[in-house]
Amino acid sequence: MKLISTAATLFVCLAPLSASARSISFFDSTQAPIQLETFPVKGDNPLVYCSDPSGNILQIESVDLVPNPPLPGQTLSINASGNLKERVEEGAYVALEVKYGLITLIKQTADLCEQIKNVDLECPLEKGEMTLTKQVDLPSHIPPGKYNVHADVYTKDGKKITCLDAHDIEFKIRP
């Protein structure tokens, strides 16, 4: 009984203070919340640039994924186009991180020239316009849930080719 009356007394004493505190502003009324600028990749895809892409070596014009979002057990069609501002040679690399919710599934650095062989390209990648069309058969046993992908791509000299994120790619249980 004593605990209840102490709590009630505390509430009664703090109620006027909390009522007056609502009218006190710790911030200038003209201040706005911080809004982070995002840089989505054009096309039907879940991709965003990690930061302003204007200084990147690869200027992506568009990326279209069909279906979007990708579905387990189905073929994913990728159509992409862009412009390389300079030649990309052997030694370029990609730092890749894939997460399932908060769990990191993959965190590795890989040779870009080895990886692009999977999409029928090879190094050196010459300066200029490029297109990519690829069909990828997705396994039917992708665990359901939300995935996040982060890829930083650099030349052999450490110059940024591009940096991309894909957030909340959701795979659902197929009926």
Swiss-Prot record:
<dbReference type="InterPro" id="IPR039670">
    <property type="entry name" value="NPC2-like"/>
</dbReference>
<comment type="subunit">
    <text>Monomer.</text>
</comment>
<dbReference type="InterPro" id="IPR033917">
    <property type="entry name" value="ML_PG-PI_TP"/>
</dbReference>
<keyword id="KW-0445">Lipid transport</keyword>
<dbReference type="InterPro" id="IPR003172">
    <property type="entry name" value="ML_dom"/>
</dbReference>
<dbReference type="InterPro" id="IPR014756">
    <property type="entry name" value="Ig_E-set"/>
</dbReference>
<protein>
    <recommendedName>
        <fullName>Phosphatidylglycerol/phosphatidylinositol transfer protein</fullName>
    </recommendedName>
</protein>
<feature type="propeptide">
    <location>
        <begin position="22"/>
        <end position="37"/>
    </location>
</feature>
<dbReference type="Pfam" id="PF02221">
    <property type="entry name" value="E1_DerP2_DerF2"/>
</dbReference>
<dbReference type="GO" id="GO:0032366">
    <property type="term" value="P:intracellular sterol transport"/>
</dbReference>
<keyword id="KW-0813">Transport</keyword>
<dbReference type="GO" id="GO:0032934">
    <property type="term" value="F:sterol binding"/>
</dbReference>
<feature type="signal peptide">
    <location>
        <begin position="1"/>
        <end position="21"/>
    </location>
</feature>
<keyword id="KW-0732">Signal</keyword>
<comment type="function">
    <text>Catalyzes the intermembrane transfer of phosphatidylglycerol and phosphatidylinositol.</text>
</comment>
<comment type="similarity">
    <text>Belongs to the NPC2 family.</text>
</comment>
<dbReference type="GO" id="GO:0015918">
    <property type="term" value="P:sterol transport"/>
</dbReference>
